Amino acid sequence: MSRFLLPVSVVGTVIGGTVLLKDYVAGGACPSKATIPGKTVIVTGANTGIGKQTALELAKRGGNVILACRDMEKCEVAAKDIRGETLNPRVRAERLDLASLKSIREFARKVIKEEERVDILVNNAAVMRCPHWTTEDGFEMQFGVNYLGHFLLTNLLLDKLKASAPSRIINLSSLAHVAGHIDFEDLNWQMKKYDTKAAYCQSKLAVVLFTKELSHRLQGSGVTVNALHPGVARTELGRHTGMHNSAFSGFMLGPFFWLLFKSPQLAAQPSTYLAVAEELENVSGKYFDGLREKAPSPEAEDEEVARRLWTESARLVGLAMAHGSPGRGHAIPR
């Protein structure tokens, strides 16, 4: 009998350790029970994955939720699903293609005209490790969608957010930002050989730098902005990595994926927390890893890099030339 005790003990320890690791990786549910009745929320990329789950969570809490997506067919289905699950009729789909500056401006104009307020902006949409594609305006796709598109959208909606204060901006970054570097000599990957992983890391570093710089410019406005790493989730974001398309990887790495990958529902909890938690009302310019505040990479803390990136981004998206736009110029001088 005693010869079975050691194997059983080892198996029990392994199973227990696996469960604890799974719980740690998952990060848990949003600890805040706050509701947001009467508040208007915009979630980009909300037709699937983390974005859809974030929209669902905020609709459950009573928000007027706008799903801003490129694929309107999928977006309408997502909005219908959320209305059905939450019984909240104030959930709708609007077209927003972050790979098109024209589409971003059209969306912003529509929101400014039709919405009395914008209380929460969740910049969630992203592409990851795609081929060397470019946006409608010629920007490298990951830099254009993950960062530049949200940079323009946020600036165009700033006046509405300020008028709705206290309001919040949540920017989804990634742990991958720590491997990123802002190459001001070739932001658009036109001179060097394209590296899709490095391009993704650069785009996510840009998101954190944008968050830091914007928080300085928003001081005293009643608008806060924070960035977060939601965790690694099982979503369509990784469709270009090849991991989900390989039978071998699915078989060999399936247990690893199960252990270390969050469900979209759990990955949406940090965004929900930053959007609603009363204790975070005055917190701004911070980076969160899941539900916990954490120091970002050293380059993400470089104020000179952040200011330079802002100036270059404004030039690239034409903010200074957007005469008559509510977000023209640098929006809030610093």
From Swiss-Prot:
Protein's recorded name: Retinol dehydrogenase 13
GO cellular component term, pick one: mitochondrial inner membrane
Annotated compartments: Mitochondrion inner membrane
Gene3D superfamilies: NAD(P)-binding Rossmann-like Domain
Residues the record lists as binding substrate: S174
Class in the EC hierarchy, top level: oxidoreductase
Lineage of the organism: Eukaryota, Metazoa, Chordata, Craniata, Vertebrata
Keywords, alphabetical: Acetylation, Lipid metabolism, Membrane, Mitochondrion, Mitochondrion inner membrane, NADP, Oxidoreductase
